[in-house]
Amino acid sequence: MKSDQSKDTQVAFMARIDKITVEETIPLRHSVLWPTKPPSHVCLPEDATGTHYGAFLPLRETPVAVISLFLEDLPLLRDGHDTEINLKSENSNSTIISGDEDSYRPAQQRTVRFRKFACEPEFQGKGIGTQLLVHVLSRARIELDAATVWCDARVTACGWYIKRGLVPFGPTFYKGPEEYVRMRIDF
């Protein structure tokens, strides 16, 4: 029997990853991330300056997963002191100690943020989201010269991101009823 971790990262489908228009991201962003809100809720003011990607399966014209990249600095902690985060998710019962604010944004290094990462529920757990994330992390590092990539992640997904090399930083916070934590990966 396979462990939960190998099941979670098992690749069941090989997706084709392509750059797409922001308009192609909206239906999936809306249906997966905020289905009870109007579609305009998933549109970002910076969408015009972002780079958007979709994961496609054979014989499908629409993406089954989407993600958007933006050049954006890491946020600094308000107080500049070490912060302890207690995260309890299905895959993690860990306490993470964050460094001081200088560890969040190294001087003169480019940071990239990914936002609005969504995968159709029927394709979650099949490796498509992992393929898409690995692809955009590579693109951020190679094409955008990113030293760090970060995101705001729902706390319920924190374990998934940790398995893929991201680490939480800063305190948790809310967007509406959803609890979030910032996560990052350094290259």
Tell what function each PLM region has.
Residues 140-154:
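Conserved GNAT acetyl-CoA-binding A-motif
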Residues 39-41, 50-55, 66, 111, ...:
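Short hydrophobic/aromatic beta-strand element in the GNAT-like acyltransferase core
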Residues 150-152, 162, 167-183:
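Conserved catalytic-core motifs of GNAT/GCN5-like acyltransferases
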Residues 54, 61-72, 80-90, 94-105, ...:
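Conserved beta-strand in the GNAT
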Residues 39-42, 101-103, 170:
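Short, P/G- and charge-enriched loop/turn segments at secondary-structure junctions
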